[in-house]
Every structure is written in C-alpha cells, then in structure tokens.
Amino acid sequence: MNISRSSGLMRQFLLQPLRKGCDISCLGRSSWRMSRSFSGSSVLNEINLSRTKNLFLNDCKFNKNSFEKFFARRLSNSVAPTPGGILQETEKIPSKKVAFWLLGSSALVLAIVVVGGITRLTESGLSITEWKPITGVIPPLTDEQWNQEFELYKKSPEFEKLNSHMTVDEFKNIFFWEWFHRVLGRGIGLTILLPSIYMIVTKRASPWLSKRLIGLTGLVGLQGVIGWWMVKSGLSEELFSDGSHPRVSHYRLATHLAAAVALYIGLVWTGHGILQRHAFLKSMKSGSTSQLTSMVSSVQKMKGFRTSVNSFVGLVLITLLSGAFVAGLDAGMIYCTFPEMGEGRLAPSKSELFDQRFCRKDDKSDLIWRNMIDNPSLVQLEHRILAITTFVAACGLFIFSRAKRNILPKKIKTSINVVTGVVTAQATLGIMTLIYVVPVPLAALHQAGSLVTLTAALSLAQRLHPEYALKNIRSWTKLISSPPKSSISSSILTQQRQFHTFRPSFHSEIKKPLPGTGIKVFFVTPEGREIMIEGNEEGACEGSVACSTCHVIVDPEHYELLDPPEEDEEDMLDLAFGLEETSRLGCQVLLRKDLDGIRVRIPAQTRNIRLERPKA
C-alpha cells in the first residue's frame, strides 16, 4: 500500500530505519506480513513468541512457552542445503564448463571475424576459387601443387582485371589468409558441433540448452554456405566485362558478417547467461535471496532505462553492420579526414550523396535507398553518423549512471563504465583508421573493437534482464521436504541464518491495543497450529526488502473483504513460490474492524517463526 494510506507516525518509525539501511524483519500491531517462501525452505517446529513493547525485533532464541499479543516472523530467504531443506535439481543446470566452452567458442568467432577483415583488406578473398570442405584443409605443399592452384586463380576475373602481374610467390601471401580463414571456420564448426551433439545425444544438456545448441550449430552450417555464396559473387562471369571491378558483393559480405554476429551473440548471451544463473544460484544457497529478489525487482522497475539500453544494443548492431558496407565498397579509402569530409565541409554535396548513376530504375524512384547502400560517400557518412550517435548514447548512459549511482546495482554501474570506455576506444580507433587511410593493423583492431563493444552492450543488457535467469533457476530446482523431527537437533540452531532488526527509540507513543479494541488475526502455521495476535486499527507499512518478498494465504471468507491488489503487489506476488488463489502480501493489508477474526495460512515452506523481546 502507499504511504498516503499510512499514518504519519507509521511513516516515521518505518522509513527512518530504512534510511539507515536496516533489515526490518516484521511489523507487529499496525500490519501483518509474511516473507515470501521459497520452494523447499525447511520448516522448523520450534516457534518463538514472547511479549514485547517494541515493534522491531532482535535475534531469536527459541522458546516455545511464551507468546502473547504480537506475532512476528521471517522466512529464510535461503535455499541453502541445511538439515531442513536441500536444493535439488529438477532439470539439469548447465555447468560452468559449458559456459566457458561457449564463451571460448565466441572468442574464436571474434578471431575469425578479424581474420575475415584482414582477408578483405589484403584482397585475398578470391584467391581460392574452389570449395573443398574436406580436402581444402590441406594447403598446397609442393611447387607443382602451388602452380596448379595458381593456374586456377589465373582464370578468375580478379587476376585478369587487377592482378595479371602477380607471381606465384605473391599469390602465396593472399592464398594464406583465405586458406586460414576457411580452416579456422571449419575448426569453429567442429568446436561447436561435436560437443553439442555429445551433450544432446547423451542428454547432458537440458531442454533449454539443447534448443540453443541446435540453433547455434545451425548458424555454423549456414555461415559456411553464406561464405561460399559470397565468394561466388566475386567469381561471376559478368566481372570479366569492361568497366567492372572484381570483388565480392557488399550485400553478401554484410550478410556473411551478420550471420557471424548472430552466432557470436548466441554464444555470448548463452554463455554469460549460464554464469549469471550460477551466480544467482550461489546467492540463493548462501542465504542472500532477499537481496537477489530485491535487486531483480528494482531493476524491473527501471523500464525506461532498460528500453534505452536495448535501443543502445540495436544501435551498436546497426553501426557494426554499416561497417560491412564501408568495407565492401572500400568507402574508408575516401575522405580520410575527420570531422570534415572534404575541405571545410562536414558532408559532401547533395549531388554527390544522391548520385543518379547509382539508380537502376528509369524513373529514378530508387535514388535515395540505392545511394544509401551503394554510394561509398553516403555509406561512409552514414557510418560516421551512426558511430557518433553510439558514442553520444554511451556518454548518456554514463551520465545517467552517475546521477543514479545510489540506486543502480554495482554490477550494472560497472557494466556502464565498461561500455563507455570501450565505445570511446572504438571511436578513437575508427578515426585513426580513417586518418591513416585504413592500415591493416588499425583496421583489424577496429573490426575487433566492434565485437568487443557489442559484447559490453550485451553484458549490460543481460544484467538489466535478470528476471529470466531467476525464473530459470526456480524452474530448474526444488527443495526436498524437511527431514523427520528427530533429525532436528541443537546443531540446527547454529546453522540457521539469524535475522537482525533495528530498534528505533521514537515509537513509544504507539501503545498496545486497549482491551476489546484490538483486531484479532489468526495465523495458521504449516503444522496446523493456530496463533492469535491482536493489532491496532492503523496504517500498514509502505514496504521494505522484507515485505517485498512475502505472502500469506487468506481465508476465502475474508479474502473477499480485502481491497483488490494493486499492480505493484501483483508484480511482487509473481516472484513468490507456493502461491494460491487467495495469496496476498501481508504488508499490503490494513487491519480494519470488518477483518476482525481474519485467518491466514503461513506458506508451507516458512521457517523461523519467532518473536523476541527486544533488548534494552
């Protein structure tokens, strides 16, 4: 419920400890609430209830003999393997080794993209005129084999139009880069294909991971087909005609790069996602689930920021792919100055940017879009605009993170810092590559930087969508029920997580209900034990880390008397386990006269139901 519905006094004693960073375990008379249960948390049979004049509680010492007016409780937000509950997989959780394999494969994809860029820069891509998936792995080893390969190259349009002066030794240099590119591609295919087949056939991969692996192996095969389709465009008979310039189609080059980027994204996203899920699982086992769910909830509320980051990832992708058009058209070889394109001009003339010579229709209706993808001058200008926009957007994210540094999780702030640094370095590399007229080392670094930038953006985006990882962890695991009571010994008390609360000194005006004026609330424990408390008819809490992860199951008779849940409450309930049709957040229920005698069941997974007299 909103603060506006709470009394001023309630706001005072609740929000003050929140500002001081305390963990508010419960609120006694003014409202009731129950922390969210995680499937499999153990249920302790010991219940500690004792008299208190204070609404804020300290550590519990189990005492079954004392309870009176006020009831407090705290779910264990940990799914740690304790004697009372053991985490068990219901679906095979991908191991970290799988994540490292996928990320290692993505590094190989990055390497082949760089090698492909060098192949394009050295004009080596058409040096091998045949497609031999098996025998092509072995390069020519003797002079006779080299001469045979060179004779095949002599029949290509590129040799006849551009390299008729080339010798066998010069041919060996360009042959190496194309051969290395193809062999590396085959190696990547085997690196992804063989482990994928093994894991799927032996059922070592979960259904979720199996689908990903099938998609990734399909992309590998598709990439090989696209690569040869691209090379064939540079061997076309039409390129023998006068005025032609033998080179691969820049459309197919962009498609080839796009397929590689899609494979790279799939590998990085899946590998990083597995590591993220393991990090969440570790948090749940260590008892930090409340912090984890609080983080997920707070991140989900940053809808505008998440949309901005998603748009930023799209912008990085478009900028990257526009670079393929720049490379395919050799557009980086013109206007090698920055920021000007020509003397004293930020852009060439309109007639140059929209040249009618690039039109293919008689009525010139394709003037604009044809120039956008075929005109080197306009293509370079587009890449500049996209790159500058990406840089400005990254700076905007950085400024936002500084302004919101108190509410953004640390890892997200770190990711934004990395994105800003990488984008700045990439922009600098791009300008240097242009000014120095596309030297191969700088251009290769610039191409590698594009994928590094994409990686940083993807990592940030994935951190801003943690709900998917958390949902998977919950669906993949369950908690074994509590062991027999005999197994609960004194040792369990030392293993239970202790919960601390802050005891403010300014709530003394809040008094116990006068006889006959209190509103009775009956809590039914998982063991069927009924506990009655009385509370005043006054405001409930605004909410905290504790109450944002809680729910109880209201008796149907009284459920109809409650106000309908608001959107925020429904969002929180979506994160909880063990929900039933009448589940509600306790912190959102105001005690009223018509609710006198209300009965609520505590979720079966609850443990550590306790109340402790505060220390003086």
UniProtKB/Swiss-Prot annotation:
Entry keyword Iron: yes
GO CC aspect terms: mitochondrial [2Fe-2S] assembly complex; mitochondrial inner membrane; mitochondrial matrix; mitochondrion
GO terms assigned for molecular function: 2 iron, 2 sulfur cluster binding; iron-sulfur cluster binding; metal ion binding; NADPH-hemoprotein reductase activity; oxidoreductase activity, acting on NAD(P)H; oxidoreductase activity, acting on NAD(P)H, heme protein as acceptor
Binding of heme b, residues: 383, 446
Region (Heme a synthase cox15-like): 45-465
CDD domains (UniProt xref): fer2
UniProt-listed Enzyme Commission number(s): 1.17.99.9
Residues involved in heme o binding: 181, 256
Top EC class, one word: oxidoreductase
Record's keyword terms, sorted: 2Fe-2S, Electron transport, Heme biosynthesis, Iron, Iron-sulfur, Membrane, Metal-binding, Mitochondrion, Mitochondrion inner membrane, Oxidoreductase, Transit peptide, Transmembrane, Transmembrane helix, Transport
Residues annotated as domain 2Fe-2S ferredoxin-type: 502-606
Pathway noted in the entry: Porphyrin-containing compound metabolism; heme A biosynthesis; heme A from heme O: step 1/1
Spans annotated as Mitochondrial ferredoxin yah1-like: 516-616
Binding sites annotated in the UniProt record for [2Fe-2S] cluster: 541, 547, 550, 587
UniProt topological domain (Mitochondrial intermembrane) ranges: 119-182, 234-254, 333-380, 439
Record PTM: The etp1 preprotein is cleaved into 2 chains after imort into mitochondria. The N-terminal chain containing a heme A synthase cox15-like domain etp1(cd) is a subunit of the membrane-embedded cytochrome c oxidase complex and functions in the respiratory chain. The C-terminal chain containing a ferredoxin yah1-like domain etp1(fd) is released and serves in the matrix as electron transfer protein.
FT transit peptide: 1-45
GO biological process, one term: heme A biosynthetic process
Pfam families to which the protein is assigned, alphabetical: COX15-CtaA, Fer2
Signal sequence coordinates: none
Spans through the membrane: 98-118, 183-203, 213-233, 255-275, 312-332, 381-401, 418-438, 440-460
Membership in a protein family: In the N-terminal section; belongs to the COX15/CtaA family. Type 2 subfamily.
Name recorded for this polypeptide: Heme A synthase-mitochondrial ferredoxin fusion protein
Organism for this UniProt entry: Schizosaccharomyces pombe (strain 972 / ATCC 24843)
Gene name in the database record: etp1
